[in-house]
Amino acid sequence: MTAQWQDEAATFGNRSLRDVDYVYVWVDGIHVKVRLDTDKICLLVMIGVRTDGHKELIALSDGFRESSESWADLLRDCKRRGMRAPVLAVGDGALGFWKAVRDVFPDTKEQRCWFHKTGNVLAALPKSAHPGAKRALAEIHQAEDKDHAIAAAKAFAAEYGAKWPKAAAKITDDLDVLVAFFDYPAEHWVHLRTT
């Protein structure tokens, strides 16, 4: 059975990507708790949506944590197999993916995951501030357009920045890549905000 799985994995990992254009890709590193030689291995996952709207797994690979070297290896392999630069990539801010994608597919735009970002912001706030902060963050990523999102981000920084500057900076420092999804069709926004 293991040999069959290995054959299927090799076939999947070597298939041509020349005939497919991926508009958007979502990336994440999944840390699994299994007993291996090292505890720093994670699964690097890249899912893409084609121009026809079909979503599919593009690549799955093991990597050392979520290092830029591991992501670059995965991306270079996809490029070698014919993958062209996706228009937009969505992922969390902790990934080494961003350095790797800038090197391998420099024309790909970046969108940070709002689910992860919300968790990061809340971690920098006392629990008593969470309900209001969640509402304020939702006003940013659920705004009617990019201008309203930027205005909501400024309001968030004004409300929370004096007492909790680290929480506010998590939004203001990354604002351009948090609101990038607004540059794409509105019907795609719900999918592009998060991994």
Task: Set out the residue ranges of the language-model regions.
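RNase H-like nuclease fold core
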Residues: 2-91, 95, 99, 104-107, ...
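Non-catalytic, well-ordered alpha-helical scaffold segments
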Residues: 41, 95, 116-119, 131-135, ...
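A short, ordered amphipathic alpha-helix with a cationic face
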Residues: 62-64, 123-127, 190-195
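Short, charged, low-complexity patches
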Residues: 68-71, 126, 130
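Inter-helix linker motif
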Residues: 106-123
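A polyampholytic, Gly/Pro-enriched intrinsically disordered region
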Residues: 128-145
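Acidic/histidine-rich catalytic cores and adjacent linkers
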Residues: 143-195
